Amino acid sequence: MAASTPLLSRGTLIKQGAEAKVYALPSLFPEPTTYHPGSSSSFSAASPTPVILKHRFTKTYRHPTLDASLTSQRLTFEARALARAAKAGVTVPKVVWVDEKAGVIGMERIEGWSVREILGGGAEGEVEVIEEQEIEEDVENKAEDSAVREEPEGPESEGLKALKNLGVTQEHLMRSIGAALARLHKTMIIHGDLTTSNMMVRLTPGGSGPYEIVLIDFGLSSQAQFPENYAVDLYVLERAFASTHPRSEKLYAGVLETYAEGLGEKKWKPIQIKLKDVRRRGRKRDMTG
């Protein structure tokens, strides 16, 4: 039996897709309890830390040897990408468990709201079905949703209200996102699935600021080699804004502005050129179907 099996059995399934299942646990291991001799009372030594377990389950349509190799490679790169990002100052979940054989990676559970929720895109479902995605640089596979949904604006989300109470505007939030993405791309890592659902806002009482942006779900991350790799990453986020958050052009412009400032003109220029090319290809695909 794999070491991760008991952990998965204790978890609650919160997301399911073609590549992986995600479970939530109140803690990685049962909370230790200390007993005092001569006393009937006891207390826990430490508060439990909620965790997330992502299980890349076996794909029966692949040869077992190939499946095991791909699962191990993707799991290892995800863990290393998170470590590199954290070292570079990008706020990401802490990795607390890696079981390559079972295809399981464990991370701290981020308490807060997704940027999607804050901007009024709605909360993700309790169990979300995700379309299978492969790690490819081809923009046509990364920017699938071309329709812009025109939806009426609803009431302010709980997260947005909390930020407003701290004096934080949507513009401040966009700048924070741009700065976080610049730090990530400086490490030569691309996220691979940049959406507002994969960005969390966590309040930080007593910290250097009232909140922080936490980038999550690095399952499709990869090593960047060319400016176009970064441009595709940005374009995926641009399309996510357009499809989930109507009339958000100014907000995304704020993300790009701060991103460019964080990278510096020398690094930003070639990415900017490629981003324009990627947009043109995306528009052409929309028109031709």
UniProtKB/Swiss-Prot annotation:
Keywords: Activator, ATP-binding, Chromosome, Cytoplasm, Hydrolase, Kinase, Nucleotide-binding, Nucleus, Phosphoprotein, Serine/threonine-protein kinase, Telomere, Transcription, Transcription regulation, Transferase, tRNA processing. It comes from the Eukaryota. ATP binds at residues 14-22, 54. InterPro entries: Aminoglycoside_PTrfase, Kinase-like_dom_sf, Prot_kinase_dom, Tyr_kinase_AS. It catalyses: L-seryl-[protein] + ATP = O-phospho-L-seryl-[protein] + ADP + H(+); L-threonyl-[protein] + ATP = O-phospho-L-threonyl-[protein] + ADP + H(+). One of its GO terms (molecular function) is ATP binding. Its main location: cytoplasm. GO terms for biological process: tRNA processing; tRNA threonylcarbamoyladenosine metabolic process. Component of the EKC/KEOPS complex composed of at least BUD32, CGI121, GON7, KAE1 and PCC1; the whole complex dimerizes. Belongs to the protein kinase superfamily. BUD32 family. This protein is considered an atypical serine/threonine kinase, because it lacks the conventional structural elements necessary for the substrate recognition as well as a lysine residue that in all other serine/threonine kinases participates in the catalytic event. BUD32 has protein kinase activity in vitro, but in the context of the EKC/KEOPS complex, the catalytic subunit KAE1 switches the activity of BUD32 from kinase into ATPase. This is EKC/KEOPS complex subunit BUD32. It comes from Cryptococcus neoformans var. neoformans serotype D (strain B-3501A) (Filobasidiella neoformans). The gene is BUD32.
